[in-house]
A protein has these predicted regions:
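Active-site-adjacent core segments of small-molecule enzymes
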Residues: 1-485
Length: 485
């Protein structure tokens, strides 16, 4: 006979009645000494933690990464140390601008945040389903996100704000072109590629550094939603992508992605006219071809959405020995911002939660703080240096090689590199006629309510990318090209 599980309070006290509040008589007022009622309501009031400022609506799954190629030439990281080696992973997909209850089928980049639970700690590659981003200096990130959120007065989203910002930030053109193409609304999360987007680094056992860009190629192929179908699903099944991912894994249809990288030497980076750390631009795959590294599959759904998907706290600052960052400005800003956002959203000790805790364990001198539940370092000293032989000690063998720098500290104008148009134009010219028509139609539909001043300014950018691109948008909006040129 199965033993009965007794309902208790949070303090473990058995609950005799979970159907009726305690009252003064059958029709009298409730009593404050009904601690079960008070505790239940108080906890309910605090069930919701602050949602992410961006990437609030998300879906996730666990899986396994397997190395398929020898990586010793590039990295000393242990997760790469042998072919066929496997490492647990956690991948969180998301939309970017929408709130936690928004539709999965909005036109928006998709977050592609991948965690490797390695034997040397957690390694997080917090990317998107696009290889570039809208801006390249984190100083403008709050401004950009404000344009994607709701207006202060009306609490409505504003195409005027979006296009006003984009038209005054022409480095956004490449990402805008991707966003309004057929790939702007993926058919769920399984049928899209992922990217690290930024430039990262790998460091080998000899201390040699290579710059890399990460690419995740969907084994399921690419599928996108037509805008009309996306709109229909937003009303009939707003959790469409979440449902598709969860149910596919439950059926045993495990999605897979091939992990590839582009590699650039430090010498090549130093001699390039175009900044290789500019996240608004891609590297040529002809010059820097994709190199396969491995493959991962997602094969297990979370047991509890809040505990795992909502409380997971990914951060680009999580890197392991043999893996590093780069001078990419946006990456540098995110290294601080993401971990700081997690401390605000989840709490000071967010790394101790099961979904965030490294499998390798941790040893440091961090103590106390709200919701500390790991023993708090016990009786060990909470300072360093100290005389205790068993206390954690620094390990100089993990030091990264020096990074050569040049120039004085200053606020350098990143717009001295003003080629915002060639890669967006190249992308437009790669599209077939149907894809070009869809791109232009999507932009025209999105800009219809925008002021003529902003329309003219943005069309000028499209024209510089490709004359047919600008002319198509101008015709759709009824703008005389003579006003633009």
């Amino acid at each position: 006979m199965t033993q009965k599980t007794i309902l208790t309070t949070a303090g473990g006290v058995p609950v005799a009645d979970n159907q009726n509040s305690r009252s003064a008589g059958p029709r009298g007022p409730l009593l404050l000494d009904d601690f079960h009622l008070v505790e239940k309501l108080a906890h309910f009031n605090r069930e919701v933690i602050p949602e992410r400022r961006v990437h609030a609506k998300g879906s996730a799954a666990y899986g396994t990464f397997k190395v398929t190629q020898d990586m010793s030439r590039y990295s000393s990281a242990r997760l790469f140390d042998s072919v066929d080696k496997q490492t647990p992973v956690f991948l969180r997909f998301s939309t970017v601008g929408g709130e936690r209850g928004s539709a999965d089928t909005e036109r928006d980049p998709r977050g592609f945040a991948l965690r490797f639970y390695t034997e040397e700690g957690n390694w997080d590659v917090v990317g998107n389903n696009t290889p570039v981003f809208f801006i390249r200096d984190p100083l403008k990130f709050p401004d950009f996100i404000h344009t994607q959120k709701r207006l202060a007065q009306s609490n409505l989203k504003s195409p005027q704000a979006m296009w006003d910002f984009w038209s005054l930030s022409p480095e956004s053109l490449h990402q805008v072109t991707i966003l309004f193409s057929d790939r702007g609304i993926p058919d769920g999360y399984r049928f899209m590629h992922g990217f690290g987007s930024h430039t990262f680094s790998l460091i080998n056992a000899e201390g040699q550094r290579h710059w890399v860009k990460w690419h995740y190629k969907s084994r399921q192929g690419i599928k996108n939603l037509h805008p009309s179908e996306a709109t229909r699903l937003a009303g009939s099944d707003p959790d469409y992508a979440q449902r598709d991912l969860f149910e596919a894994i439950e059926r045993g249809e495990f999605p897979k992605w091939r992990v590839c990288m582009q590699v650039m030497s430090e010498e090549q980076a130093a001699s390039r006219a175009v900044n290789p750390f500019d996240v608004t631009k891609v590297w040529s795959q002809k010059e820097f071809p994709l190199i396969e590294v491995g493959e991962f599959e997602l094969n297990r759904n979370p047991a509890n959405y809040f505990a795992e998907v909502e409380q997971v706290a990914l951060a680009p600052s999580n890197v392991v020995p043999g893996v590093g960052l780069s001078p990419d400005r946006m990456l540098q800003g995110r290294v601080f911002a993401y971990a700081d956002a997690q401390r605000h959203r989840v709490g000071t000790n967010y790394q101790q939660l099961p979904v965030n805790a490294p499998l390798s364990g941790y040893s440091n001198y961090q103590r106390d703080g709200a919701m500390r539940f790991d023993g708090n370092g016990g009786a060990r000293p909470n300072y360093e240096p100290n005389s205790y032989s068993q206390a954690p000690k620094q390990a100089p063998e993990y030091r990264e090689p020096a990074l050569a720098l040049s120039g004085a500290a200053d606020r350098y104008d990143h717009r001295t590199d003003d080629d915002y148009f060639s890669q967006a134009g190249d992308l437009f010219r790669l599209m077939n006629a149907e894809q070009k028509a869809l791109l232009i139609g999507n932009i025209v539909g999105a800009m219809g309510s925008v002021s003529r001043e902003v329309q003219v300014r943005q069309i000028a950018h499209f024209l510089r990318a490709d004359p047919a691109y600008g002319a198509g948008v101008a015709a759709g909006l009824g703008v005389d090209l003579n006003r633009v040129m």
